[in-house]
Amino acid sequence: MANVSIHPAVDGGVVHGSTEGFAGGTLQCLCASDKVTVDVASQSAHNHACGCSKCWKPEGAKFSVVAVAPRDKVTVTAHPEKLKIVDESATIQRHACTGCGVHLYGRIENKDHAFYGLDFIHTELSQQSGWSPPGFAAFVSSIIETGTPPDQMDGVRARLTELGLTPYDCLSPALMDALSTNVARHKGLLH
């Protein structure tokens, strides 16, 4: 299965280095000069390969690799004027560099959303090591929407499993539980 390419950050194997004590780093766009930079003053969480059609992916990748960090720990530190929201109607407001197209962070503005307060980040845009490694794959079937032939999906899922990234066609069970718990709380069924 090694011939199925997922994403450059995981194709050679998921690196499970030491994350203890890691307190964050700086994300940079891919422009040659006047780079947009975003400081993330926190370890990332829920890092995963995402097959949705909205997330930024490097050239040729079937999946993005995306994690979350607390919103109050994510700060644009250089060239905010180059950022533009990709789709203002989307739940996740993805802030992309107008120069190179890279998504620097995604933010949820709906205070009632279960993930409000968490910003989505691409740790591969950081030169610092120590970020949490990817732990699962989400929205796997969605890569069909971006051009992967359906008859390749068994091979893609096998490769994800081989890499230790359990494939889901939604989010991981813990994140789906968080979404459902939020809905139940808003309905008054849980406190």
UniProtKB/Swiss-Prot annotation:
Residues 22-169 form the CENP-V/GFA domain. The keyword Mitochondrion does not apply. SUPFAM superfamilies: Mss4-like. It catalyses: S-(hydroxymethyl)glutathione = glutathione + formaldehyde. It comes from the Bacteria. The keyword Metal-binding applies. GO terms for biological process: formaldehyde catabolic process. Its EC number is 4.4.1.22. Zn(2+) 2 binds at C50, C52, C55. Disulfide bonds: none annotated. Its cofactor is Zn(2+). Transmembrane segments: none annotated. GO terms for molecular function: S-(hydroxymethyl)glutathione synthase activity; zinc ion binding. InterPro entries: CENP-V/GFA (IPR006913), Formald_GSH (IPR014185), Mss4-like_sf (IPR011057). Zn(2+) 1 binds at C29, C31, C97, C100. Keywords: Lyase, Metal-binding, Zinc. Binds 2 Zn(2+) ions per subunit. Pathway: One-carbon metabolism; formaldehyde degradation; formate from formaldehyde (glutathione route): step 1/3. Belongs to the Gfa family. Catalyzes the condensation of formaldehyde and glutathione to S-hydroxymethylglutathione. This is Glutathione-dependent formaldehyde-activating enzyme. It comes from Xanthomonas campestris pv. campestris (strain B100).
